[in-house]
A protein has these predicted regions:
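Surface-exposed loop and adjacent secondary-structure segments within mature catalytic domains
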Residues: 1-19
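Histidine/acidic residue-rich metal-binding segments in metalloenzymes
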Residues: 1-5, 28-42
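Alpha-helix initiation and N-capping motif
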Residues: 8, 30-31, 70-71
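C-terminal functional module detector
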Residues: 14-23, 34-188
């Protein structure tokens, strides 16, 4: 990872199992997982794309742009205001202290995490991840859900992202899910 090139290496393709725990990844090499990249100080936003070779798109990228124009979309991607979705069109709003996903922020006090999800089916689980480990999870069982969580154990320098898992499955048994781009937080 070279921070000099961070503005062009802002997105990473999200496979359904790229971010799994216990060292079980698509590549079988934990050094190549996004979690390892982030733990080593890497900065990237998460996008979804497909490589099914069958013409059946499943993964998508949601972009939080101020308007529906090419310049606004590319500006949002450069600032990592995007997230990956697999199968369903899940709407995900993840913020810390009112700052959007993709931002690097300095705060006083503890991070106030806010997650709003609008799913297309029941939300099985919302997972807040800090520095590669689960910080908080909620099993709402409804299509729409909100999480407000204060990270009392904040150490002063962390990254956070959110995973959303829906109850529905595709024809291969894969659940619809979404990954927010991270937010990097430091104490002032």
């Amino acid at each position: 990872y070279d921070p000099a090139y961070a503005s062009v290496i802002v997105n990473t393709e999200m496979w359904p199992d790229t971010m799994q725990y216990e060292g079980k990844t698509y590549t079988g090499n934990t050094e190549k997982t996004l979690r390892e990249f982030l733990n080593k100080g890497g900065r990237t936003g998460f996008v979804g794309s497909t490589d099914t070779h069958e013409g059946k798109p499943a993964a998508k990228t949601a972009v939080l742009a101020g308007e529906l124009t090419r310049p606004a979309i590319f500006e949002a991607l450069r600032h990592r205001r995007n997230y990956a979705v697999f199968n369903a069109k899940i709407v995900l709003d993840f913020r810390i202290n009112s700052h959007f996903m993709g931002e690097e922020i300095e705060i006083q006090g503890k991070p106030q995490i806010s997650v709003n999800v609008q799913g297309t089916d029941k939300i099985e689980e919302i997972i807040v991840v800090r520095d590669g480990t689960v910080l908080h999870s909620l099993q709402p069982g409804t299509p729409n859900a909100k999480v407000d969580y204060l990270d009392e154990a904040f150490s002063g320098n962390s990254y956070y992202y959110v995973r959303v898992i829906q109850a529905d499955k595709d024809e291969h048994g894969n659940r619809s899910h979404a990954w927010s781009s991270p937010i990097w937080v430091k104490n002032k």
